[in-house]
């Protein structure tokens, strides 16, 4: 009985989290010219970091060294996260002549 309740609660939390993420993803309407071609991603590296006695933090490993420790002000435990910013405005328009010329011919 205890396992069924725990499983039910986990599924309910995942459903609520999924709905929350979907709603948050639809927050932009695409009218903002500057945000249209920008993407900021955050991924959990699968580990946590802790503050040592000397005040330093344990190293975050994984994701080819792109993981960093993020923590709240007075907490002793943080999350190892990998962040990446991509600005697609640096790339040419997919319909430009340069892209069409570089496309393979049939």
Curated annotation (Swiss-Prot):
It comes from the Eukaryota. Keywords: Disulfide bond, Glycoprotein, Secreted, Signal. Glycans are attached at residues 48, 54, 64. Residues 1-24 form the signal peptide. One of its GO terms (cellular component) is extracellular region. It is found in: Secreted. Disulfide bonds join 45-67, 49-69, 60-80. GO terms for molecular function: C-X-C chemokine binding. Salivary chemokine-binding protein which binds to host chemokines CXCL1, CXCL2 and CXCL8. This is Evasin P1168.
């Amino acid at each position: 009985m205890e396992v069924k309740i725990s499983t039910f609660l986990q599924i309910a939390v995942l459903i609520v989290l999924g709905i929350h993420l979907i709603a948050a993803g639809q927050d932009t309407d695409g009218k903002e010219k500057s945000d249209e071609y920008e993407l900021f991603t955050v991924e959990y590296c699968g580990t946590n970091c802790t503050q040592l006695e000397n005040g330093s933090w344990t190293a975050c490993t994984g994701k080819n060294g792109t993981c960093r420790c993020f923590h709240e002000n007075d907490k002793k435990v943080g999350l190892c996260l990998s962040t990446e910013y991509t600005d697609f405005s640096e790339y040419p328009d997919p319909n430009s002549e340069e892209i069409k010329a570089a496309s393979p011919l049939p």
